[in-house]
A protein has these predicted regions:
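Secretory targeting signals
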Residues: 10-75, 108-128
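Short helix-to-coil transition segments within interhelical loops
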Residues: 1-7
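Surface-exposed beta-strand/loop patches in extracellular or lumenal glycoproteins
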Residues: 228-248
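A surface-exposed beta-strand-loop module
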Residues: 237-238, 248-293
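Short, well-ordered beta-strand segments enriched in hydrophobic/aromatic residues
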Residues: 222-232, 288
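N-terminal, polar/Ser/Thr-rich
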Residues: 45, 158-222
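Membrane-helix interface segments
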Residues: 4, 45, 76-81
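Terminal transmembrane helical anchor/hairpin motif
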Residues: 77-156, 177-195
Length: 293
């Protein structure tokens, strides 16, 4: 034979993969046509490209790669078919929506919502999770070429396949570690913010009588100028104004009645220190400029 196991496996994988990818593109083209000509909403091409990259390709890679690897090891297509159907149902029904979508190999549960305003809100999560699935699928394909004994294969081809397996598994492991570290940090942040909110719940807060927000959208960030009238509770005076603001937004300037005021941040809690206490039921004007994601 003039070709190796690697050529044979790649031919099978690309043949099946291109067939499914072609069907996917046909379906997306039909949906895009309906979206473009029959839906009274602005047309955006980005969701179709991103869905193909993060939805279709990793799923094809991991399902086809794992299938050919199991066939090579178990040498029973019927058994592999049953195992793959069981795995698909397990990921679709039981594991897909759990563990931060890490086992959602079909891409059915993980959010892929596109916004004209902010784009993909979870781009980092998609790259890490779906990148892990893609690399694992490629590693399975290379391992199939390495373990198959159908055709003779040169030493260089074996070394290439082994290098691909090690590289892809290493990359998938690194992405997985980054992902779980980020999820752990996010969980810790939510717990910390919940505890801070529980403590702040006992603190008297001003109420907003009126507010004016000037929002400037700058790519993936926003710049906001806020002009608010705040009123103290009727029964208590305030020497500190307790406000809440997304921790991803950084306060650049803050003033009380057009005079600069000092403030402190504790995650989402913003404490504005007043030069003189705000009497009960009295009002005050606060201006603030902040920006961030």
């Amino acid at each position: 034979h003039s070709y190796s196991n690697l050529d044979y496996v790649l031919g099978k994988v690309f043949g099946v993969g291109w067939a499914f990818l072609f069907l996917q593109l046909v379906i997306l083209a039909a949906v895009a046509g309906i979206h473009r000509f029959f839906v009274p909403l602005p047309f955006a091409w980005q969701p179709y490209v991103l869905y193909t990259l993060f939805g279709t390709l990793p799923t094809l890679a991991v399902t086809i790669g794992l299938s050919v690897l199991l066939v090579t090891i178990l040498r029973s297509q019927a058994l592999v078919f049953v195992l793959m159907v069981g795995l698909a149902m397990l990921c679709l029904i039981v594991l897909g929506h759990r563990y931060h979508y890490y086992f959602d190999i079909l891409g059915f549960h993980i959010p892929m919502m596109w916004s004209d305003f902010v784009g993909l809100g979870n781009l980092e999560q998609l790259i890490q999770v779906r990148g892990t699935h893609l690399l694992f699928g490629v590693a399975c394909v290379a391992a199939t070429a390495l373990l198959s004994r159908r055709l003779r294969q040169s030493r260089s081809a074996n070394l290439l396949a082994a290098a691909v397996v090690i590289s892809c598994l290493g990359g998938a492991t690194w992405l997985s570690m980054q992902y779980w570290e980020a999820r752990s940090a996010t969980t810790h942040l939510r717990t910390q913010m919940r505890d801070l909110s529980a403590v702040a719940a006992a603190t008297s807060m001003p109420s907003a009588i009126s507010y004016d927000l000037q929002v400037d959208h700058q790519g993936t960030q926003i710049a906001v100028e806020a002009d608010m009238i705040l009123r103290a509770p009727a029964e208590v005076a305030l020497d500190t104004l307790l406000l809440t603001l997304n921790p991803g937004l950084n306060v650049e300037e803050l003033s009380i009645d057009d005079a600069p005021a000092s403030f402190t941040r504790d995650q989402h809690l913003l404490r504005v220190h007043l030069a003189r206490p705000l009497a009960a039921a009295d009002s005050i004007r606060l201006k603030m400029r902040y920006r961030g994601q």
